């Protein structure tokens, strides 16, 4: 299926930038060593492949998912074959002693890329998953930044999100705080990041869910009032690699997308997706009707859909890659904007936040409100959008 046509574009967004920089990109990658953390997820595997095809000296991939690593290797071997350099994967947790031992015995890396994250807004639905989100998005980044600095790596790259700009949910807030910790480390190691939008058909995404619903003869459900920007998986890998190699210290890369041309509702993508499969959407009134019709309608060329306004916690009404007051470079690259950051952070507040969260964790008795209180200390203007409803309560 042509992902570009589904998201309303005709060409790869970063094609011109890649073509202009690819000679330098190949020279740098082929003479460098890379560690990709979280490298078997959708974005991680995309950037891993972008590195692999440029023949790095060493490429190590760490991911907590053994199954995803197996598929990554199968995918790479089947599509690209082999490289002259050292390519290995490791099914280990970055917070573990095994990861520390790997770094101690690896000989170091020129570039460390961290793609691991809990990315779903729904992960704030309970205090336990929420705490793991903070651990993964903030503290594992803080830990591996320190380790990359100790290894004398040239650059550390980590993924932020458009939701970190004026966050309204705790996932976005966690990434905004991650940026603050990264700025603190930027005094010892060069750091660059990327903020980007939804990656079409990435694992767990709503578009990925469309595929699964069709496979299982289940109805398609989507909000009809939420407009989002989309990148293809390949574009996500390209953006990350370009930021890694060409980003200056504290740069945050983001795609230049036009809200009048590139914002699209999930319900519109659902209609296009179904049309590609030869179906017309049949609009249902409720979940029960949609479930019943999913077993009988498709054979007649119709597919049951439930499109309704979003009413769950943390859904942002609009997307933005930067906020008022951030300094921008819109000239350096053709289809990538850059947020230029100074080393603005309050080290004392970051340490208090870290210690308070770790104390909550050791207490075994924290609440979502406890976490929110600490987040507000670091982001006083955090406009948390709480409705009391979560996506897990809906189809």
Go through each PLM region and give its residues.
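Strand-loop microenvironment adjacent to phosphate/nucleotide-handling motifs in alpha/beta enzyme folds
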Residues: 6, 24, 28, 184-395
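A short, basic/flexible loop-to-alpha-helix module at the beginning of a structural domain
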Residues: 9-32
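Conserved glycine-rich cofactor-binding loop
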Residues: 40
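Hydrophobic/small residue at the entry helix of a nucleotide-binding pocket
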Residues: 43
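NAD(P)H-binding glycine-rich loop region in Rossmannoid oxidoreductase-like domains
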Residues: 46, 50-56, 61, 77, ...
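Helix N-cap at the beta1-alpha1 junction of Rossmann-like dinucleotide-binding domains, i.e.
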Residues: 63-68
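Rossmann-fold cofactor-recognition segment
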Residues: 80-96
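Conserved Rossmann-fold NAD(P)-dependent oxidoreductase catalytic core, especially the SDR/UDP-sugar
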Residues: 114, 118-176, 184
